[in-house]
Amino acid sequence: MIDNQHKTVLLYEAVDSLNIQNDGIYIDATFGRGGHSSLILSRLGSQGKLISIDRDPEAVKKAKLMKDPRFSFIQGSFSDLYHYVKKLDLMGRINGLLFDLGVSSPQLDDAKRGFSFMRDGPLDMRMDPSRGLSAAEWLMKVNVENLAWVLKNFGEERFSTRLARAIVERNRLNPIKSTKELADLISHVIPVRNHHKHPATRSFQAIRIYINNELQEISSALNAALEILSLGARLSVVSFHSLEDRIVKNFIRQHSRGPQILRGLPLTEIQIQSMWQPKLKLIGKTMPSQKEVLDNPRSRSSILRFAERIN
């Protein structure tokens, strides 16, 4: 039941990395439009199970179309992964867990969701429009200092303070209500440095990440993975920008290599091992092929990292 209008990035590579077992129990923590879930189901045997999660209303509609007794769907955030699995009494029994982070193409292409500076629509940006403040509402409340912090830390925007002042001042005079209004303001304030990249790219990313608490949710879900996965299970994560990938890379490194021990400390290797045991084994990373990037330019920045649960 794959959405023909949505090209799932690293589709086969991500599912291959899960090393599917016929009778295994798998979680697709970011159902989206069902691309990964459909392929996982095609590789499962009759006794296998797939649990998919998403909070996006359009994803919920797609999931309802998947009529398969091996498939179940949870409407919610993947940051609550631990609680979902505990409620299902499946702790330590999950054979594979997949995350496909960020915003999907259908979300970007739907103007009324307010994610894209390329399509004019209400300035919303919420993954779940029924919860929390929209981007427009938040921008009306935030002060210059806090907005500049978000733009700098979540968008790596060099002109964060200048832009924050302009947004707050504009909202004081005439509230920003649409994506086009915000994009036009950003384009006016920020000098064009890269003609291949819209000046609003970083700011829209930063605001979206903040509105949806994305980075904290990723960290929470990754920590839950260590509790829910069985020995030998796979953890696979597709990320799309450096902030996401840094969290994933550091998490896998931390739980496969262990803490950094300062040189000169009087500790033997046996003492260090007694204090800490690795929980993950790095298996590899994959980036899209040249053909995939040509077919789907949005895949260009993606990277898949995958590891195995050990000990």
From Swiss-Prot:
It comes from the Bacteria. It is an enzyme of class 2 (transferase). One of its GO terms (biological process) is rRNA base methylation. GO terms for cellular component: cytoplasm. Keywords: Cytoplasm, Methyltransferase, rRNA processing, S-adenosyl-L-methionine, Transferase. Its main location: cytoplasm. It is found in: Cytoplasm. One of its GO terms (molecular function) is rRNA (cytosine-N4-)-methyltransferase activity. S-adenosyl-L-methionine binds at G34, G35, H36, D54, F78, D100, Q107. Its EC number is 2.1.1.199. Gene3D superfamilies: Putative methyltransferase TM0872, insert domain, Vaccinia Virus protein VP39. It catalyses: cytidine(1402) in 16S rRNA + S-adenosyl-L-methionine = N(4)-methylcytidine(1402) in 16S rRNA + S-adenosyl-L-homocysteine + H(+). Belongs to the methyltransferase superfamily. RsmH family. Specifically methylates the N4 position of cytidine in position 1402 (C1402) of 16S rRNA. This is Ribosomal RNA small subunit methyltransferase H. It comes from Hamiltonella defensa subsp. Acyrthosiphon pisum (strain 5AT).
